[in-house]
Swiss-Prot record:
Catalytic function, reaction form: cytidine(1402) in 16S rRNA + S-adenosyl-L-methionine = N(4)-methylcytidine(1402) in 16S rRNA + S-adenosyl-L-homocysteine + H(+)
Entry keyword rRNA processing: yes
Protein name, per record: Ribosomal RNA small subunit methyltransferase H
One GO term of the biological process aspect: rRNA base methylation
Keyword hit for Manganese: no
One of the Pfam families matching this protein, by short name: Methyltransf_5
Species lineage: Bacteria, Pseudomonadati, Myxococcota, Myxococcia, Myxococcales
Purpose: Specifically methylates the N4 position of cytidine in position 1402 (C1402) of 16S rRNA.
Localization, UniProt: Cytoplasm
GO CC aspect terms: cytoplasm
Family that this chain belongs to: Belongs to the methyltransferase superfamily. RsmH family.
SUPFAM superfamilies: Putative methyltransferase TM0872, insert domain (SSF81799), S-adenosyl-L-methionine-dependent methyltransferases (SSF53335)
Organism the protein comes from: Myxococcus xanthus (strain DK1622)
Broad enzyme group: transferase
Amino acid sequence: MTASDFQHQTVLLREAVDLLRPADGRVIIDGTLGGGGHSEALLASGATVVGVDRDPVALAAATARLGANPRFQGRAGNFAELPRVAADLLPVDGVLVDLGVSSPQLDVAERGFSFSKDGPLDMRMGPDGPTAAELIATTDERELVRILKDYGEEPFARPIARELKKALPTRTLEAAEVVKRAVPRKAWPNRIHVATRTFQALRMAVNGELEALDALLAAIPGLLKVGGRAAVIAFHSLEDRKVKEAFRALAGRCTCPPGLPVCVCSGVGDFALVTKKAVAASEAEVEANPRSRSAHLRVVEKLR
């Protein structure tokens, strides 16, 4: 896949941009540049935008499209590494991270993310690290069970892991067939493909997605100016739960010095929840882009 092939439908575009309040002089980091849709809208509102992405194809495509704007610059990196990747800019006025897999990554068979087309069982968002096939081959069965349970919430993790270790699939459709064999037909879910949770778990393990999210959430206080906002778009319960809990902790955390015998700050944190509940895609957006159905946007603001 080349940069010219990278076309992506941006999720919760208006909602995310409006809540980040871009304006002249404000600096916002788009930690998951992808197709550049969010960054383009932020630029249109006058902000200076630094787009970060670990996928070199996505970075090249978005930079080719947006690079003529002097208020844009693209940088290679993982959003977990923003304190390093954007060290010269910090603190900033806003940070946006969209945790979804982009449409080109899902739709291009060679990337190996989807069982809808046959391709190598890869699943890497960047060029480095082991592929999903290599992960299956080198991970013992017990650890594979943990991955399927923790990252995919897969109820049939044990039989699936056992069959994956027997078959050692190297192609996407081959892996999907292994899952089909491992799960009793009467237990197949109605609304999703029987291999969906397994593919999600493998992808998250290959790319260290939950670990990257943990690193981002821990870094937020140091990334933002007072008045700055962080916006995170999550697509499944594991991620959204982490974001929700982290933002609530920031907003309600006691800020008293450690030596005080009692709390005198009333538990008021250094942050405020901008979104009391997660913002979901509108019916119109879901109709136009079904992948937005599971998107949840949460925003927090630094108070001091």
